[in-house]
Amino acid sequence: MNILVINTGSSSLKYQLIDMTNESVLAKGVCDRIGLEHSFLKHTKTGGETVVIEKDLYNHKLAIQEVISALTDEKIGVIKSMSEISAVGHRIVHGGEKFKESAIIDEDVMKAIRDCVELAPLHNPSNIIGIEACKQILPDVPMVAVFDTAFHQTMPRHAYIYALPYEIYEKYKLRKYGFHGTSHKYVAHRAAQMLGKPIESLKLITCHLGNGASICAVKGGKSVDTSMGFTPLQGLCMGTRSGNVDPAVITYLMEKEKMNINDINNFLNKKSGVLGISGVSSDFRDVQDAAEKGDDRAQLALDIFCYGVRKYIGKYIAVLNGVDAVVFTAGIGENNAYIRREVLKDMDFFGIKIDLDKNEVKGKEADISAPDAKVKTLVIPTNEELEIARETLRLVKNL
């Protein structure tokens, strides 16, 4: 069974075609600059070369058509016709409280996704456009929505309710939702396999560290707390996001800097974090280069980030009453030995110790624990597309 996985952005569309008989990627690619000048499709057939096709992609429907053309092309394709696509799995950023797991897309599900637009105004509209475009091109193919928020719907009430008047939660569903759920779920299950233990018996802390970053406490395979909140702005200091700040800072700044709502949103989401502290970049590699050359602000940005991750790990060890493994994933978590080392230094008290040589690993699965560590430390590259494909298969196989 071949499953097409789609991740739609406002001007981009990423895709993978996965053969679920052996969970192998047949082809993958991205349509970029949709609706803009100089749009193109970048397509890679597994084992083949990457091809860039310049094409006027005025909208997402044209982008989907171009994806199907590439997948079925005699030279660069991997299937003979689009009838070989059994189902489509869509990444949806926000499912609100409505979706505790993935769902087959019908009119009711579409309405519920639209209802969540105000919770994710930057992402859900693009996700909806992607679904509608796919339905026009592949009208008879079942489609599944896989939500970034769904994995965290198992959090207990005391973990997700903010200490605001309860009526505000009831009126606006204003609460912690958490994000990166598909990634946290994938690496938690993979960690259980690597440890050779049933996930139901494990306490895990998963660290999704990329330009956006979040930590998750996983008990028995279920999320019990996570660092992101009502939006992805809560929690850790990130590439351009501030993470946790005293809420009073916002009104203070609005008054002092004469900022409006859009200004303060942009300030906290786009100009803060590692970029704001360092004044160098939101890319950790650039910031590390600057720090190594003696840039004090760059070093401070790295220290603040690592300190934040350390605090959440400590916090979640308390929440879980211990931990069996700490897992690092995503761009920084998978590839940055310095960040992993700084995050986990002086954690012997908790039984967490890493082997510095093993820690040099980049972009592949590894157990980097020291031989005498009581707690395992794992590096696991995330695979959100495969997790989306698995969820899609689970729901459509009995149709």
Swiss-Prot record:
ATP binds at residues 14, 208-212, 283-285, 331-335. The keyword Glycoprotein does not apply. Its cofactor is Mg(2+); Mn(2+). Substrate binds at residue 91. Pathway: Metabolic intermediate biosynthesis; acetyl-CoA biosynthesis; acetyl-CoA from acetate: step 1/2. Mg(2+). Can also accept Mn(2+). One of its GO terms (cellular component) is cytoplasm. InterPro entries: Ac/propionate_kinase (IPR004372), Aliphatic_acid_kin_short-chain (IPR000890), Aliphatic_acid_kinase_CS (IPR023865), ATPase_NBD (IPR043129). GO terms for biological process: acetate metabolic process; acetyl-CoA biosynthetic process. The record marks 180, 241 as: Transition state stabilizer. PANTHER family: ACETATE KINASE (PTHR21060), ACETATE KINASE-RELATED (PTHR21060:SF15). Catalyzes the formation of acetyl phosphate from acetate and ATP. Can also catalyze the reverse reaction. This is Acetate kinase. It comes from Acetivibrio thermocellus (strain ATCC 27405 / DSM 1237 / JCM 9322 / NBRC 103400 / NCIMB 10682 / NRRL B-4536 / VPI 7372) (Clostridium thermocellum). The lineage of its organism: Bacteria, Bacillati, Bacillota, Clostridia, Eubacteriales.
